[in-house]
Amino acid sequence: MSADPKVLLTDLIKTALKSVAPEHADTAILLERPKQASHGDFATNVALQLAKPLKRNPRELAALLLAELPASNLVAKTEVAGAGFINFTLAAAAKTAVVGEVLAKGADFGRGAKKNVKVQVEFVSANPTGPLHVGHGRGAAYGASLSDVLCFAGYDVTREYYVNDAGRQMDILALSTWLRYLALFGIDVPFPPNAYQGDYVIDMARGLRDAHQGRYAGVTLAQVLEGTPGLPVAERKDDEAKQQRELHLDGLIANAKRLLGEDYPFVHGFALNEQLGDGRDDLQEFGVHFDKWFSEKSLFDTGLVERAVAELEKRGHIYVQDGAKWFRSTDFGDEKDRVVQRENGLYTYFASDIAYHLNKYERGFDRIIDIWGADHHGYIPRVKGAIAALGLPPEKLEVALVQFAVLYRDGQKTSMSTRSGEFVTLRELRREVGNDACRFFYVLRKSDQHLDFDLDLAKSQSNENPVYYIQYAHARVCSVLNQWGGEPAELQAADLGKLENERELALCARLAGFPEVVQGAAADYAPHQIAFYLKDLAADFHSWYNAERMLVDDEAVKLARLALAAAVRSVLRGGLAVLGVSAPESM
């Protein structure tokens, strides 16, 4: 028998329905906890649901259902309330049974049955052109926690990072590294303001020099600048000046490719691998892992980009204008049509994105979840439109948006960037407040809500700090169990009937709700629901701990209370693990 009272009550109600209205025996039963404790432990509106199709008064129908409800010693009281609700008050044994179930199942309590549903979650996928910043951190924490929640709920999950290793941004990184490298050999090319500025580029240049000396420095300043339009004065911010800077950058990239020749792919690969490796290490330290790192370049190498565009063309969704190929995305709800292949023959980023999603569908996932920054909201219609245009079901793709996190210190909004103009990095944040606080605070709100990240609160060792408060509850249980020093088997044999007071029964009810919270968090893509649950569970435990002694003289009462405490510890540890947070045994 399940210790979940909802399962028990649902079975009882369905049995009654088979007698009263067999044609409606498969009706979904909704059970909720009443807001007022005086209304019992659970209430259902099934009589209100069926009153109209059965042409019966809902209160009369509720009374009929109660008359046919099988007797159960786990239900203490039933009543018809209000317009036709049925309230249930559970017997103490039904409430405390969850303790034994938690102790028996351990880390598997709350784990959902295998659903045979393949889910792909793609997240972070930051351009490997610089260190991960605090914005990437929220996407990483959310994506990792969501993946773990889905996995715990019973889904077959693949965690994926899309590596943007093709295209202009990587060329700009390679150029930036090479120009800084040349400067180490006295070749001082004026550094473009639209190249990558961070100190990490200088560090990469030094690494390139240390590994290969002056192998890539056999050029002159004139050769590097040959044919470029030059840079406008820094004060100019007009569109013409911006365009000139972009043309100058493109000219430098073309010259780098020509002058380096066969060595250009190596410099390009060196810069990519340095940044990608740094990002991997950063995420690994953050407890964020991926099953697959998917290369954008592979889409071109395998011809999938060309095949995807050709398929759209074959289906009549492509037209040519001014030498470029355009996708008719306005036919699918987008605000304007989009270029997929430029007049120079190069494919756009959107084209590779179409190919990547085609690849996801061809890999046979039942559900595809993309986690994007909230600023990419407008990108959704064109991607879903392309999927539909390829003859694939766009509803299989779901996009979860992540808002940026804002840092606060001393109650004041703090700068999100350093002197060099770079965003505060994820590594800097982790080093200041710790991994646990980062992982927990990042998922304290719905992903599409703005997040105010209070640095002082995240570092504080107080009850106001939610992660500290939860971890402290876990450590408190560990301390009590260590003082006791007995064997786990003694707790599994405890007489749970000794759990009688209001706080103990409330804790049992909270524990029993964990499996439902897991399924809800998975269904809503909302790991914050587990964070909220853990805060409530910790609050219930601290309240009980402060009011009652665990190690009392009465052996039966002591074992029952220790069993309840051990069950709380198990669920706290399991819930924190799903969120990527540790559960220390002492604090």
Swiss-Prot record:
It catalyses: tRNA(Arg) + L-arginine + ATP = L-arginyl-tRNA(Arg) + AMP + diphosphate. Pfam families: Arg_tRNA_synt_N, DALR_1, tRNA-synt_1d. It comes from the Bacteria. A motif ('HIGH' region) lies at residues 126-136. SMART domains: Arg_tRNA_synt_N, DALR_1. It is an enzyme of class 6 (ligase). This is Arginine--tRNA ligase.
